[in-house]
Regions:
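Acidic, Mg2+-coordinating active-site environments of NTP-dependent enzymes
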Residues: 2-128, 152
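Active-site flanking residues adjacent to catalytic metal/cofactor-binding acidic residues
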Residues: 19, 131, 159
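Histidine- and/or cysteine-centered catalytic micro-motif in compact active-site loops
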Residues: 43, 134, 160-162
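Conserved cofactor-binding/catalytic machinery of classical short-chain dehydrogenase/reductase
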Residues: 88, 135, 139
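Active-site beta-alpha connecting loops in nucleotide-dependent enzymes
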Residues: 113, 138-141, 145-182
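Hydrophobic, well-ordered secondary-structure elements that form the walls
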Residues: 117, 132, 157
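Switch II (G3) loop of P-loop NTPases
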Residues: 128-135
Length: 182
């Protein structure tokens, strides 16, 4: 699998790569790619590093650090994955010649896709609601783990397995919900 992905990081396929070095395969890829690589991380020094990360039901905030500058970033999409996705986006933008400042500021205007880790308006009630179209056991575990990070009390999950789509996953999804929600 890794060798198949490595083909994407050759001169025939790309001019530059933006790689998450917090991922073991990404760290390996950063060393083995045949093209210039820019790295991103929230755990170690990289070309694009996130620090002072704060996350809640309304999104994530962090300090974006490059070799030259630091910027506060806020993205109105909750979840740890948002930090990685936004770092990757900044890297892609700068690879296309967009200044890092412009890319970082644009993230604050970003809103997620409806139904993907979407924070719903609870009109001031003392709870949050996250809507997500998690339709695999892994996706359900990921969203519940994400929401658990900023849940102060109980985490209640309501999910469904629509239609006749892959009925084998249903008991697994139920088990994942039972193990990862209250």
């Amino acid at each position: 699998y890794y060798q198949a992905k490595l083909i994407l990081f050759t001169e025939q396929m790309a001019k530059q790569a933006i790689v998450n070095i917090d991922d073991p395969y990404g760290a390996r890829l950063a060393k083995e790619a045949q093209i210039p690589v820019k790295t991103y991380s929230e755990k170690t020094l990289a070309d694009y590093t996130a620090s002072q990360i704060e996350s809640d039901v309304h999104g994530v905030s962090y300090i974006l650090k490059t070799e030259d500058v630091s910027f506060p970033v806020h993205v109105a999409i909750p979840g740890a994955f948002t930090v990685y996705n936004s770092l990757s986006a900044v890297g892609a933008c700068t690879a296309m010649g967009i200044p890092v400042e412009t890319a970082a500021q644009a993230l604050s205007k970003l809103h997620g896709v409806h139904g993907r880790c979407e924070s719903l308006d609870t009109q001031g009630r003392p709870f949050g609601i996250i809507l997500d179209y998690a339709h695999t056991p892994d996706a359900l575990v990921n969203i519940l783990s994400t929401v658990r990070q900023f849940t102060k009390n109980r985490l209640i999950a309501v999910f469904g397995c629509g239609g006749d789509r892959d009925p084998i996953k249903r008991p697994i999804m139920g088990q994942m919900a039972a193990e990862n929600a209250d």
